[in-house]
Amino acid sequence: METGLDTNARKNRSGEITETLVARIFNNTGIHYREQVSSKEFPAIADVLGVDQKVFDFVISTDAKTYLIEVNFYSGGGSKLNEVARSYTDLAPKINGVKGFEFVWITDGIGWNSARNKLQEAFAAIPSIFNLTTIISFIDQVKKS
C-alpha cells in the first residue's frame, strides 16, 4: 500500500513542480494569470462542457482572447498519458469553438517518449500544445493578442 501511495505522491509533486515552474515563467515574462479557475466562471464554456466541468491550472485573459491552460509533466510512461491526450483531444475543440477562448496544453517529460503516437494525434486536434522549451512562443502569442 505504501509503495502505491509513494508513486502517487511523486506524480503529484512533479505536476505541482511543473505548475510552479510555468507560473515563474509567466511572472518573469510579465504575463498576468489566474490559477485553478473553474470553467463555471465562463458561462459559454460551461455550456459546451455540460456536466464535464473543469478546473484549469491557469487562465490568461487578454483583450482579444482568454486562454484556458492545462499543465502536466510525465516522468514515466503508462495509460495515464494516453487517457490525458484523449481527454484533451476531446476538450480542445469544444473550447476552441467558443469565440474568444482557446485551450492550451503545456506538457513535458520523458514519459512522452513511449507515447509519441498519442501526442502526435493530439497535435492534430489541439493547435496549442507547448512544452517547457517552446512555451516562449506561447508567451509571444499572448503578448501579441
Name these PLM-found stretches:
Residues 1-27:
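Interdomain/boundary linker segments immediately adjacent to catalytic/signaling cores
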Residues 8, 28-50:
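A short acidic/basic microdomain associated with nuclease active sites
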Residues 23-35, 62-65:
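Secondary-structure boundary elements
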Residues 1-5, 66-71:
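Glycine-rich, often proline-containing surface loops adjacent to acidic residues and nearby aromatics
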Residues 51-56, 90:
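Alpha-helical scaffolding within the catalytic cores
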Residues 54-68:
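Active-site beta-strand-loop-beta-strand hairpin of nuclease catalytic cores
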Residues 72-117, 121:
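Catalytic cores of nucleic-acid endonucleases
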Residues 106-145:
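Domain-level recognition of nuclease-like catalytic cores that cleave nucleotide substrates
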